[in-house]
Regions:
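A surface-exposed partner-binding patch
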Residues: 1-112
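Surface-exposed beta-strand edges and flanking loops
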Residues: 18, 63, 119-122, 130
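Generic macromolecular interface patches on structured domains
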Residues: 51, 159-160
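Short, solvent-exposed coil/turn segments at beta-strand boundaries
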Residues: 102, 122-127
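Structured loops at beta-to-helix junctions and adjacent beta-edge loops in soluble globular domains
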Residues: 108-110, 121-123, 133
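Short, surface-exposed coil-to-beta transition loops
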Residues: 112-118
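Glycine-rich, aromatic-bearing surface loops/beta-hairpins
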Residues: 117, 130-159
Length: 160
């Protein structure tokens, strides 16, 4: 499935750089907090160093992005940070935001017009959520797993 997914992205002008070295995902402080990660997602982030659309407005996060070492302009938790800023110090709202994001791991971000993301919901057996600005936390389930997500992208049910 992963190879078909990557072929599809390449055919649609995505720039993909493979990771030349084996990496221990769980040595990454951010990723280790979500252990165990779904196998298909783990394979994806271990295999690739960067996966970015041709216009550079949409991208999948890879291991270096979660550690802040990739040089990407946006942080992996950018939308959580935006929400926290919007909470403007309101303690209850801030706690709600942090609680919601604690079990969600964003793996895709779009800054093409409306900001949006896809994330793995660790509270729901690794299902995939889709969220948009301005209320990122009002996300909807769009796939049962990362593998299902890739399948839906290939079939056109999910458009990146």
């Amino acid at each position: 499935m992963l190879e078909k997914f990557i072929s599809f992205l390449k055919e649609n002008d995505w720039k993909i750089e493979e990771n030349g070295t084996e990496c221990d995902v769980y040595s990454n402080e951010v990723l280790s907090a979500y252990e165990p990660l779904p196998a298909a997602f783990l394979e994806f982030i271990q295999k690739f160093k960067s996966v970015i659309s041709g216009d550079e407005k949409r991208f999948f996060f890879c291991v270096d992005d979660y550690s802040g070492e990739s040089g990407l302009a946006f942080k992996w938790n950018e939308f959580e940070l935006i929400s926290l800023e919007a909470a403007n110090g309101d303690e209850d709202w801030t706690n709600d935001i942090r609680s919601w994001w604690k079990t969600k791991i964003p793996f895709y971000m779009s800054v093409d017009g409306e900001y949006s993301f896809y994330a793995i919901d660790m509270d729901d057996n690794g299902s995939i959520l889709s969220g948009y600005e301005p209320e990122f936390e009002e996300a909807d389930k769009v796939a049962d797993s990362f593998e299902d997500f890739m399948s839906k992208v290939l079939s056109g049910d999910i458009v990146l």
